[in-house]
A protein has these predicted regions:
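A short, basic/flexible loop-to-alpha-helix module at the beginning of a structural domain
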Residues: 33-48
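Flavin (FAD/FMN)-binding glycine-rich loop and adjacent Rossmann-like elements that form
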Residues: 38, 42, 86-88, 128, ...
Length: 488
């Protein structure tokens, strides 16, 4: 879809259904409604910045912090009331700060993602908000390290870091459009209960997960719709040690990691069972609701994540499809609690203590960038002459692993949105190959992409250049000064 088609669609407001799930399609899809209301023009107050980051999730938090620390006057626009995104809503742990060394005897252990992402972990450690980098004692052919977090503490710590860096943090604020000057973004439109405003800037970063800013700016994109819908719940009044014994009694343990939990080291912080070995009643009902047995925690009596998958065709840009998925997943959450109460010792009085504000779809719009990372780039461990991030995890392991427990590089050009002079992208909105995306979309990769794009945006703003005119040596120097690790 091109800019003209998208812009035409988003300016048309259809009359929705009066009750139940709507049958109409949202902006950017076929079968548009035939009745419209034309909004009158009005003057908007303007705020001016060097850098605007759209989306305060996994990548956006780091991007905005990096830009501000680089000296840029930075604004962050986030639709929810807190930062964090998928880290606090859909993930089971942060994957992964390290290479997959444990699966390859003789390979050196090395932390390959550092900088601001590691600083977040350091601050979480001080307040009991993470397991630390807990080594996997079982299942290390999937990941060598599990970094579990407390979702609520993560929100607080990252919010504080943004404010300390001097970021103008706009939570509860909706990105509503882009103001274009040819192929350059002049500003964005944001709406909140304080009103509708224009945010002008020299450079922009799209960290919206579903590519909202890129679409508003007219960038090319597709919608692969190639992942299940996911939601997770936090479950309280449970015992992870008894859950471990339950899985062990059925010889079902597949993954296990020990780290900091409730102030003590060496405790189980991640565990996953092989569902096929569990009692038939549990196994069959878990399959029906798409429930995984994996959980992580940093507390004795709390499962931070119980994940549920829903295999139904849902586009995150289609409001009505999403509504149906939201309802179905809520029903599945209730069933998941019933299963734990019935089958798992120590969970007889379990209850849901946290739900996500919305479903998570691992990919929405796929934004076209100047370079598209291939699966061969990932598994062959390729590095580039414009690397901005070193990464070593693949979510399809052990089926797919990076060669010899090594790493690959994400090049700067893979984060430049094609056709737009001053827009960068970070997060799960890049990488077309599904297998490659199973690596690049993971949380720690997104965090590293955030530091790269935020730093680059600040440098572009400081030198009044477009994203393609930025000298790589200047970007690399700034990233190294920010603690980023390079293998090439």
């Amino acid at each position: 879809m091109n800019r003209r088609e998208f812009s035409k669609n988003v300016l048309m407001l259809g009359i929705g259904a009066q009750a139940g799930f709507g049958q109409g399609n949202p902006a950017g899809t076929r079968n548009q409604p035939t009745n419209y209301y034309e909004e009158p023009a009005k003057k908007l107050p303007v705020r001016k910045f060097d850098v605007v980051v759209a989306g305060g999730g996994t990548a956006g938090v780091v991007a905005a912090t990096a830009a501000a620390r680089q000296g840029a006057k930075t604004a962050l626009i986030e639709v929810k009331g807190y930062p964090g995104g998928t880290v606090t809503e859909g993930g089971t742990a942060l994957h992964s700060f390290y290479n997959l060394w444990k699966a390859f005897p003789g390979v050196k252990k090395r932390q390959v993602v550092r900088g601001i992402p590691q600083e977040i972990i350091d601050r979480l450690m001080k307040v009991g908000g993470t397991s630390g980098h807990a080594e996997m004692s079982k299942g290390y052919d999937f990941d060598s390290v599990c970094t579990a977090i407390d979702t609520e503490i993560y929100k607080l710590v990252t919010f504080e870091m943004l404010v300390e860096a001097g970021v103008f943090v706009c939570v509860n604020t909706l990105l509503a459009g882009a103001i274009m000057d040819g192929s350059r973004i002049k500003g964005v439109i944001a709406e909140s209960r304080s009103g509708r405003e224009a945010f002008y800037a020299k450079c922009f970063v799209d960290c919206t997960a579903y590519g909202d800013l890129s679409a508003y700016a007219g960038a090319d994109y597709t919608e692969p719709n190639d992942y299940p819908v996911v939601n997770s719940i936090g479950v309280a009044n449970v015992s992870i040690d008894k859950y471990y014994k339950f899985l062990k009694s059925h010889d079902a343990i597949y993954q296990q990691a020990e780290g900091w939990r409730s102030g003590k080291d060496g405790q189980i912080v991640r565990i996953q069972g092989r569902t096929v070995k569990l009692p038939a009643g549990f196994r069959e009902e878990a399959a029906k609701i798409g429930m995984s047995t994996v959980t992580t925690t940093v507390h004795d009596n709390y499962f931070m994540f119980i994940k549920l998958n829903l295999n139904m065709p849902v586009s995150p840009t289609n409001r009505d499809e999403v509504a149906k998925a939201e309802l179905e997943l809520r029903k599945r959450q209730a069933k998941a609690i019933e299963l734990f109460r019935e089958y798992v010792p120590g969970c007889e009085k379990a209850f849901i203590a946290r739900t996500n504000p919305k479903i998570c779809i691992r990919r929405g719009r796929l934004i076209t960038c100047d370079y598209d990372i291939s699966h061969e780039d990932v598994i062959e461990g390729r590095h580039f002459d414009d690397d901005v991030l070193t990464y070593g995890f693949h979510d399809s392991a052990p089926s797919y692993q990076i060669k010899d427990g090594g790493t690959y590089g994400i090049p700067y050009r893979a984060l430049r949105v094609a056709g737009v002079q001053n827009l960068l992208a970070a997060g799960m909105l890049i990488t077309s190959d599904h297998r490659a995306h199973m690596s690049t979309r993971n949380t720690v990769s997104c965090m590293g992409q955030g530091q790269a794009t935020g730093t680059a945006a600040a440098l572009c703003a400081a030198t009044n250049c477009g994203t393609r005119e930025l000298r790589y040596r200047d970007l690399r120097k700034a990233l190294v000064n920010g603690g980023v690790y390079f293998e090439s």
